[in-house]
From Swiss-Prot:
Name under which the protein is recorded: Asparagine--tRNA ligase
An annotated Gene Ontology molecular function: nucleic acid binding
Keyword match Metal-binding: no
EC number(s) recorded for this UniProt protein: 6.1.1.22
GO process annotations (BP): asparaginyl-tRNA aminoacylation
Reactions performed catalytically: tRNA(Asn) + L-asparagine + ATP = L-asparaginyl-tRNA(Asn) + AMP + diphosphate + H(+)
Length: 466
């Protein structure tokens, strides 16, 4: 590619007086009475478009330039100049405008240059990336993704490709999508009348993964510091602003690490990626602060400047009981904290991110390490002001006998987890890890409010368009 990106022109990479070519799409066209048109051209490389000043002396000015509308694609060659306007430092004084693609009917173009509702944009999933808002979300999402990989790379972690197809239920909740090539109209049956999965592609019942954690643990128990970052799937019939059927998870696993190490890793990672987005995507964050959530930048700046508080679940319950606030969901020891409880702790009690740890075993997964009291497990949730839970993790149960007892307690067949149990039989080691729902992270950074609006093609109950 030999043409210049918009961001490079706007940030002064090219000297004034040099000739450059920009390729992109028209955001707006403005014509002056002096016979000059001003084209705002975007290529997605940054929030702001570059202005091309087009004189009426160009051969195609009358028959093409004056017909350009929002979303027409163009190649504009011109001389880089200091901008006379206040909106940007540099512009292009156009010497040539080539129209690459026209918009067939500007009057019916679904993404015309006006404010659209969030609901409308979801219906136009194939076109919504053309809007300022979704473009900004996409650049922020990319920045966060790259920062996560960079953080773990710099810390000496290895990225592991966890499988998307699995025979294991990590969470033990049973809310999984089945993967099968069997003919649904003519299912093979066993003598007992059950579906015969021996005849299926994998010779057994298989599912889309709900988490890469168990698989990644196998590598942590050999290579010490690993992580996975990829799509996961939950067949929860939840139509909420916090749930997707397909979403991305960041899941590190660390050998020889306890719950305190885990909490420290979570804090370091979150602060690293928030500092990255503050430094690298300021233009997009300013858009969110102006049009979506006025506290978008301030929230992140306060977060990275805060020391994380820590509190035991049992003590958190006492805080909630005695705070004088009436909650929709009553507080008692043994409940799973709801969003209102989490946000009270982070926003009103601590006024900072907080790690709640040592939860009742009955509300947590089988793989979490049983504490000495026999009632709680070494689990943690990181709660952030403005959203509540942003990370969930634990120290893993490394003792085979205790793991087997927990599997039995939860009605899970230990033979289904034979390979996971092998890790405890051959050089077992304390280890810890956590899961970060990536879309919730993007929601927190942008203030968008709904996970459906921060992933390109959201998958939710009864919705799988595009």
């Amino acid at each position: 590619m030999t043409h210049a990106s918009v961001v490079d022109v706007l940030t002064g990479k090219y000297a004034v007086g040099t000739t450059q070519t920009v390729k992109g799409w028209i955001r707006t066209r403005r014509d002056s009475k002096a016979g000059i048109s001003f084209l705002a051209i975007s290529d997605g490389s940054c929030f702001h478009p570059v202005q091309a000043v087009v004189p009426n002396t160009l051969a195609n000015y009358e028959n093409e330039v004056l017909r350009l509308t929002t979303a027409c694609s163009v190649e504009v060659t011109g001389v880089v100049a200091a901008s006379q306007g206040s909106g940007q430092a540099f512009e292009l004084q156009a010497t040539e405008v080539k129209v690459v693609g026209w918009v067939e009917d500007p009057d019916t173009y679904p993404m015309a240059a006006k404010r659209h509702s969030i609901e409308y944009l979801r219906e136009q999933g194939h076109l919504r990336a053309r809007t300022n808002m979704v473009g900004a979300v996409t650049r922020v999402r990319n920045c966060l993704s790259q920062a996560i990989h960079r953080f773990f790379h710099e810390q000496g972690y290895l990225w592991i490709a966890a499988p998307l197809i699995t025979a294991s239920d990590t969470e033990g909740a049973g809310e999984m999508f089945r993967v099968s090539t069997l003919d649904m109209e003519n299912l093979p049956r066993t003598p007992a009348g059950k579906v015969d999965y021996d005849k299926d592609f994998f010779g057994k019942e298989t599912f889309l993964t709900v988490s890469g954690q168990l698989n990644v643990e196998t590598y942590a128990c050999a290579l010490s510091k690993v992580y996975t970052f990829g799509p996961t799937f939950r067949a929860e019939n939840s139509n909420t602003s916090r749930h997707l059927a397909e979403f991305w998870m960041v899941e590190p696993e660390v050998a020889f690490a306890d719950l305190e190490d885990n909490a420290a890793l979570a804090e370091a990672m979150l602060k690293y990626v928030f500092n990255a987005v503050l430094a690298e995507r300021r233009d997009d964050l300013e858009f969110f602060a102006q049009h979506v959530d006025k506290d978008a930048i301030g929230r992140l700046e306060r977060f990275v400047a805060s020391d994380f508080a820590q509190i035991d679940y049992t003590d958190a319950i006492e805080v909630l009981k005695n705070c004088g606030k009436k909650f929709e969901f009553p507080v008692s020891w043994g409940i799973d904290l709801s969003s209102e409880h989490e946000r009270y702790l982070a926003e009103e009690h601590f006024k900072s991110p907080v790690v709640v740890k040592n939860y009742p075993k009955d509300i947590k997964a089988f793989y979490m390490r049983l504490n000495d009291d026999g009632k709680t497990v070494a689990a943690m949730d990181v709660l952030a002001p403005g959203i509540g839970e942003i990370i969930g993790g634990s120290q893993r149960e490394e003792r085979l006998d205790v793991l087997d007892a927990r599997l039995a307690e939860m009605g899970l067949n230990k033979e289904d987890y034979w390979w996971y149990r092998d890790l405890r039989r051959y050089g077992t080691v304390p280890h810890s890890g956590f899961g970060l729902g990536f879309e919730r992270l993007v929601v927190y950074v942008t203030g968008m409010g709904n996970v459906r609006d921060v992933i390109p093609f959201p998958r939710t109950p009864r919705t799988a368009e595009f």
